[in-house]
UniProtKB/Swiss-Prot annotation:
Role this protein plays: Is required not only for elongation of protein synthesis but also for the initiation of all mRNA translation through initiator tRNA(fMet) aminoacylation.
Protein name (Swiss-Prot/TrEMBL): Methionine--tRNA ligase
InterPro entries to which the protein is assigned, alphabetical: aa-tRNA-synth_I_CS (IPR001412), Anticodon_Met (IPR041872), Met-tRNA_ligase_1 (IPR023458), Met-tRNA_synth (IPR014758), Methionyl/Leucyl_tRNA_Synth (IPR015413), MetRS_core (IPR033911), MetRS_Zn (IPR029038), Rossmann-like_a/b/a_fold (IPR014729)
GO-annotated molecular function: ATP binding; metal ion binding; methionine-tRNA ligase activity
Length: 546
């Protein structure tokens, strides 16, 4: 029986183009990449797209500080982000940018459809304005004293000390973060999207299982009051796309950012004629669409985005997978403590597969924060990857190469043991499918323990010294390497580079779930090369020291 290939489109949230990618960002990109690689290993068609989130006041200001045009800053960050994501073996079909002709075209199309439907209205609002820099100030560019707890130097919308949220007008002694001037209130006409028109659609969509239960329950709290209209415009000066037929008005970055997913696929379809844009985005599409996002941007992805798509006549996501934050050694990442670790800094010192494995060993389908504890990281890599997984191959390979010219035996001495490893396939694939990577890793490592126990019990090193036991040594090591082959297939979504090295060593076809069941018998393998190095504490310690 053959099952039909699934047609899947996966996105990860777009990294913002005003700073480097850090290990917190990598949680999401690694989580999504593992899932994509798993789907491909199962034989499904899975496209994986992302891109640079390139618009907004913050990018305009950062570019000014660096003496660059915003376009140059975006191009520079795009190159750096693509380098770092590639360094962590994140394999996007397209890593594009929201500052693109495709995104402009789609943003204008969606806005026009929203407007034609009567979902856009204009309203005059009062905003904080910097009289020196002559710019309207986003909340994050206003600093002052918290009106609740009195903490100084807090943002215009939230206090990082007590957690209170408020409007910039409530802030005590507010100043512009750009000039130090006291902001004034200034009126401006803005455009709003009537989100409340989509209340029933959103309730129904949220109840239909497209979100993790924790996320769905949290979102339902927003419906205790009427959904407020969403301000989708910003005033010049601003870096973004101008709103058609509205002088000096720009689309708010959060309007065109998720449209960037569509633009990235549209751009890919120009590179690859086999990719059909409409097949993935048209209303009623039978393909699957998954967004991987952090818990801080759920509101945009699970309320605004589905409502916009519905209004504009596009399909809605199959699911939105939400993850928590990363802490380092139990605390929020901090530059002063040396725990703000950029992706590039990590890659200067350690293998990306160590972190891919560690994150996988911690990730679940829950919206939980995960902690990168550096002592635990060292212990987990050395105990699991080196001590259990790689050790199994190194214990068997030498005997096969030296004593038997690289030739495996023509049958397995313990076919039942091999079969028992195969019987865990469904459990492991279910865990991968449901994002319960930590449970998958636990099962895989318990199999690695069993495989090593088998080698411990059979003692090929002792058998090799006995007379007339050559065939038994070959058989035991053939069994061990075939168990190692199964483990490698199970770990391949997490450890793609190591899996490729193993395929070269085993001299076999690319490992996947279709050829999982077939053992390598009467087959020649290549000389074994070390697959991974033990992680030294002093090497890991370099992560927290620039």
């Amino acid at each position: 029986m053959t099952t039909e290939k699934r047609q899947i489109l996966v996105t990860a949230a777009l990294p913002y183009a005003n700073g480097p990618i850090h290990l917190g960002h990598m949680v999401e990109h690694i989580q999504a990449d593992i899932w994509v690689r798993f789907q491909r290993l199962k034989g499904n068609d899975c496209l994986f797209i992302c891109g640079e989130d390139a618009h907004g006041t913050a990018i305009m200001i950062t570019a000014q500080k660096q003496g660059l045009p915003p376009e140059a800053l975006v191009a520079k960050m795009h190159k750096e982000h693509a380098r770092d994501l590639g360094g962590f073996l994140i394999e996007y079909d397209n890593f594009y940018t929201t500052h693109s002709p495709e995104n402009r075209e789609l943003a204008e199309l969606i806005y026009t459809r929203l407007k034609d439907k009567g979902d856009i209205f204009a309203k005059t609002i009062s905003q904080a304005y910097d009289p020196v820099k002559e710019i309207f100030l986003p909340d994050r560019f206003i600093r002052g004293t918290c009106p609740r707890c009195g903490a100084k130097d807090q943002y215009g919308d939230v206090c990082e000390v007590c957690g209170a949220t408020y409007s910039p007008t409530e802030l005590i002694d507010p100043v512009s973060a750009l000039s130090g001037a006291k902001p004034i209130e200034k009126n401006s006409e803005h455009f709003f999207f009537s989100l409340n028109r989509y209340t029933q659609l959103l309730k129904k969509w949220i109840d239909a299982g497209h979100l993790q239960p924790q996320v769905a329950n949290k979102l339902k709290e927003w419906f205790s009051e009427d959904l407020k209209p969403w301000d989708i415009s910003r005033d010049a000066p601003y870096f973004g796309f101008e709103i058609p037929h509205a002088a000096n008005k720009y689309f708010y970055v959060w309007l065109d950012a998720p449209i960037g997913y569509m633009a990235s696929l549209k751009n890919l379809s120009k590179q690859r004629p086999s990719v059909n844009f409409d097949a993935y985005w048209k209303e009623g599409s039978q393909t699957e669409l998954y967004h991987f996002v952090g818990k801080d941007i759920v509101y945009f992805h699970a309320l605004f985005w589905p409502a916009m798509l519905s209004s504009a006549g596009f399909r809605l996501p199959t699911a939105i997978y939400v993850h928590g934050y990363l802490t380092v050694n139990g605390q929020k990442m901090s530059k002063s403590r040396g725990t703000f670790i950029t992706a590039h800094h990590y890659l200067d010192h350690l293998s990306p597969e160590y972190l891919r494995y560690y994150y996988a060993a911690k990730l679940s389908a829950q919206v939980e924060d995960i902690d990168l504890n550096l002592d635990d990281f060292i212990q987990r890599v050395n105990a699991d990857l080196i001590g259990k997984y790689v050790n199994l191959a190194s214990r068997c390979a030498g005997f096969i190469t030296k004593n038997f010219g690289g030739k495996l035996a023509n049958e397995l001495p313990e076919p039942d043991l091999y079969e028992s490893f195969l019987q865990t396939e469904q459990t492991i694939t279910d865990y991968y499918e449901s994002l319960n990577y930590s449970k998958a890793v636990r099962v895989i490592m318990s199999l690695a323990d069993r495989a090593n126990q088998y080698i411990d019990a059979k003692k090929p090193w002792a058998l090799a010294k006995e007379i007339n036991q050559e065939a038994q040594v070959q058989a035991v090591c053939t069994q061990g390497l075939n168990l190692f082959k199964i483990l490698t297939t199970y770990l391949k979504p997490i450890l793609p580079v190591t899996a490729k090295k193993v395929e070269q060593f085993l001299n076999c076809d690319e490992l996947n779930f279709a050829n999982l069941k077939t053992p390598l018998l009467d087959h020649s393998v290549n000389p074994f090369e070390p697959l991974m190095q033990r992680l030294l504490p002093e090497t890991a310690a370099q992560l927290t020291h620039e």
